[in-house]
């Protein structure tokens, strides 16, 4: 029996184009492949939608189109995405076939195209006797999102935080006892749920490991389902054990930057004791993510922009606070004007200045200054002298400056300290030198090489 498994459609005004293009393609493809049953495993909407919202109308149109070709089971997803009651109206939108909304923990049998739900969490022995001889096409074990508030009210807040997995594992084990009977009778068994498997990988490549996740693989396989169809994680992944399969189809489209892998839906072939699943890719958005450790490389961005076309582009960089103005955002926007969308993100690194080690241990300003000079390899004497000036008044500082200027004015000139060689010449040489001068002219008083023009005629 062939199943079409969709999940995480996330219809909303912002996602409408992506969601409807991808889900519309998936519905058409599933119908063309001849799928017998459709399963939507949660998060059909991204948040609360008004009745007149175009995104809700588009979702209803596609689900109705799917129900004209096959029975459809819709599971309650995350409450923040699908507020309780959101899916109730979809049960009234069936076409040729029925749409069943699984919003409580239960088992559901599909008999001649009609869904029959258990009274309690699992089928009782009396209920099994009523239909087991009829040979249902499939029996679903439905485990929608659990309200942790209700769980906390019954078992306590502390236990609800880490004990949710144990509570769900107990239910899956109970369902497994029923599913073993069904498999022994040749009836297909399929689990449908919405949550996180411990150890799975998100669409951004992060491994989900912790104590507060809903499921473990051991608990899921203990449900004894031939196929277990999951939702919530946006990355397609599968786990197999003894021919039985647990799988996420991932989100129907690409809603965030940095998501890894193809987007699509799973087409399942399920028989008692075995199952296979194949991803059918949808025409999701093409996104380009460019990250720089420093300022963006404009030459590289030009190369990327040349092939960006109608893609969605995100450019991120990090830069220190003092150089944030060197990045021309407008130039980057102009480069990618032909792209479908551009998102620029700058991470500004604050300038961090570390204090001198041990400076806080000094009790005086003089000591702190000496400590800083020691660490910075700076001569401390001039700085200490100027620090002492701060204790004086402005008039005292000005008087000290004037006193130094006056002392410099009375210092002997360089000509006196270093007399010209002619002053120490012998007497004869001095007289000859005077006779050489023509009459009526006078020799310069001194040949001071610091003051006279040496190149005068």
Features from the language model and the residues they span:
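Extreme N-terminal starter segment of soluble prokaryotic enzymes
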Residues: 1-4
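Conserved beta-sheet core of the metallophosphoesterase superfamily
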Residues: 92-97, 197-272
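Binuclear metal-dependent phosphoesterase catalytic core
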Residues: 106-137, 244-316
